[in-house]
């Protein structure tokens, strides 16, 4: 009301937040360039992860080292979200069965956390041979939230893990092939469910005990913007939209596998913003 009083000649419309979010879903060229620069710095940090791992580390110790890498590459250290009830630090590291713990927020995966007051990410457990872990850090380097997840393993994993990881890469490839202006957001979710069901991993997809009902989300000044790749989301992709695509599978006794990359919609399709190797990296 105070803002409206400053502009007496204007009409105040309801649902202003929704209108602003819709407008912000399409980025300007300057904003897109910020994402590109952020993606380069984000990848540089992730590429150094093998160099900071030491046998006998806990998930917390390794997470701290990765956060340090992110800050040294220029990450601002702030993880901005839409909605007052959602909070986290720079991101998460989920190892082994800790990835089966449900998320308290609208995240793909959760984690027990170090304390019940913040049940998210690392729980202080030792990283074990035969375990996978997923690094999912929000790359806020220039005020715009890039999003990228990569999977690492302590030694070799069971063959099932590599098969499941490839299924996630197949989902990414299928979605990217169809991601063009005019494509409907819910169709991408349905496509992912079809692929993962045929592959036999539907029970493990997007969570174990609690499943996320999306495979992607818009990113920008906040980590959870429009569009959302989820059921019943009829919004169409438009050039300039930027979103994270994150098909993930959790395997009991092994850990998480999958992929997350940030993409910008162009006139012809999509451009990948997070350029980093996508296979499981063995430590």
Q: Which positions does each model-derived feature cover?
A:
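Active-site neighborhoods and metal-handling regions in enzymes and metal-associated proteins
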Residues: 1-283
């Amino acid at each position: 009301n105070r803002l409206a009083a400053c502009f007496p000649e204007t009409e105040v419309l309801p649902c202003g937040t929704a209108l602003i979010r819709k407008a912000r879903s399409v980025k300007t060229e300057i904003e897109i360039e910020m994402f590109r620069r952020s993606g380069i710095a984000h990848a540089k940090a992730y590429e150094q992860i093998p160099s900071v791992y030491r046998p006998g580390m806990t998930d917390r110790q390794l997470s701290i080292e990765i956060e340090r890498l992110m800050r040294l590459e220029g990450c601002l250290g702030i993880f901005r979200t839409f909605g007052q009830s959602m909070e986290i630090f720079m991101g998460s590291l989920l190892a082994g069965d800790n990835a089966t713990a449900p998320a308290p927020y609208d995240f793909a995966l959760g984690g027990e956390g170090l304390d019940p007051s913040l049940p998210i990410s690392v729980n202080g457990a030792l990283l074990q041979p035969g375990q996978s872990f997923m690094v999912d850090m929000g790359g806020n380097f220039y005020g715009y939230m890039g999003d990228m997840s990569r999977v690492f393993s302590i030694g070799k994993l069971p063959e099932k893990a590599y098969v499941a990881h490839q299924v996630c890469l197949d989902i990414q490839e299928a979605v990217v092939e169809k991601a063009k202006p005019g494509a409907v957001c819910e169709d991408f979710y349905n496509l992912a469910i079809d692929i993962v069901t045929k592959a036999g991993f539907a029970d493990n997809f997007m969570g174990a005990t609690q499943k996320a009902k999306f495979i992607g989300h818009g990113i920008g000044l906040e980590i959870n913007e429009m569009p959302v790749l989820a059921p019943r989301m009829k919004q169409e992709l438009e050039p300039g939209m930027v979103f994270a695509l994150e098909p993930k599978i959790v395997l009991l006794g092994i850990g998480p596998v999958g992929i997350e990359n940030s993409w910008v919609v162009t006139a012809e399709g999509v451009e990948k913003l997070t350029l980093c190797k996508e296979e499981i990296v063995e430590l």
